[in-house]
């Protein structure tokens, strides 16, 4: 199962808005090189219902939608890696809302919501944190030395 997961490791981030800060762009570029299966799709800022429509329109039928929300499930890095492994070769599409978050309808229509923090984060920073955690999860599952936590 582990080898299948690593071989088919493909994630997508659907994010509202653009990244404007150079240091975040640099960090994203670095992790995207390390995660060749990662795709990032940006949707325009709009009202929550319109953003939800754009997010759902961008979603492929074979993708599992995982919204990021402060109300979502908080996981350790190791627990996150194990959760990703359970999805096997299914493609996960993580969704990061804009300044107003995500519509309740979108969040409630999914099986799993993920929380990066109980605090509200700027969407640009949430994107960088998520990409780093996806990379960390991959190295945990591969037995790499990047993750040094317990």
Curated annotation (Swiss-Prot):
It catalyses: pseudouridine(1915) in 23S rRNA + S-adenosyl-L-methionine = N(3)-methylpseudouridine(1915) in 23S rRNA + S-adenosyl-L-homocysteine + H(+). GO terms for cellular component: cytoplasm. Its main location: cytoplasm. InterPro entries: Alpha/beta_knot_MTases, RlmH-like, tRNA_m1G_MTases_N. CDD domains: RlmH-like (cd18081). It is found in: Cytoplasm. It is an enzyme of class 2 (transferase). GO terms for molecular function: rRNA (pseudouridine-N3-)-methyltransferase activity. Keywords: Cytoplasm, Methyltransferase, rRNA processing, S-adenosyl-L-methionine, Transferase. Signal peptide: none annotated. Its EC number is 2.1.1.177. S-adenosyl-L-methionine binds at residues 68, 97, 116-121. Transmembrane segments: none annotated. Specifically methylates the pseudouridine at position 1915 (m3Psi1915) in 23S rRNA. Belongs to the RNA methyltransferase RlmH family. Homodimer. This is Ribosomal RNA large subunit methyltransferase H. The lineage of its organism: Bacteria, Bacillati, Cyanobacteriota, Cyanophyceae, Synechococcales.
